[in-house]
């Protein structure tokens, strides 16, 4: 079993929704809802986001970290980085040290986010 990033009990019962994305800061905020609730229970913040793949709403907040090789493959496949980076071990190491592939499996698809970090927030700043 893979380790859950946020360690939320009954994580598959929660619903996620994209709340805001700030391209200048590369920050992605997600609203997380308990079953049958219309107000968010909490938020998730992904920082230094390079990639997001998924619908704007989905079931499950059971995020886990994918393999660093899968993260690098996705960065190469999408053209975010070029294959030349593989010729420079220091650059390759920096990417694999800072970029993480966050995954969540839903009943219908797999959500993929490449970011440097993720945090759970009780509230979000009022000015966003």
Residues of each region from the PLM?
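Surface-exposed, interaction-prone regions used to assemble/regulate multi-protein complexes
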Residues: 1-128
């Amino acid at each position: 079993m893979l380790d859950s990033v946020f360690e939320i009990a009954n994580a598959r019962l929660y619903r996620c929704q994209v709340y805001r994305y700030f391209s200048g800061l590369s920050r992605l905020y997600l609203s997380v809802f308990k079953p049958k609730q219309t107000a968010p229970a909490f938020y998730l913040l992904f920082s230094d986001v390079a990639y997001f793949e998924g619908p704007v709403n989905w079931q499950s907040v059971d995020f886990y970290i994918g393999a660093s090789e899968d993260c690098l493959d996705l960065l190469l496949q999408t053209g975010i980085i070029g294959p030349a980076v593989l010729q420079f071990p220091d650059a390759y190491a920096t990417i694999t040290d800072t970029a993480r592939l966050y995954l969540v499996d839903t009943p219908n698809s797999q959500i993929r986010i490449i970011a440097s970090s993720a945090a759970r927030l009780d509230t979000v700043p009022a000015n966003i």
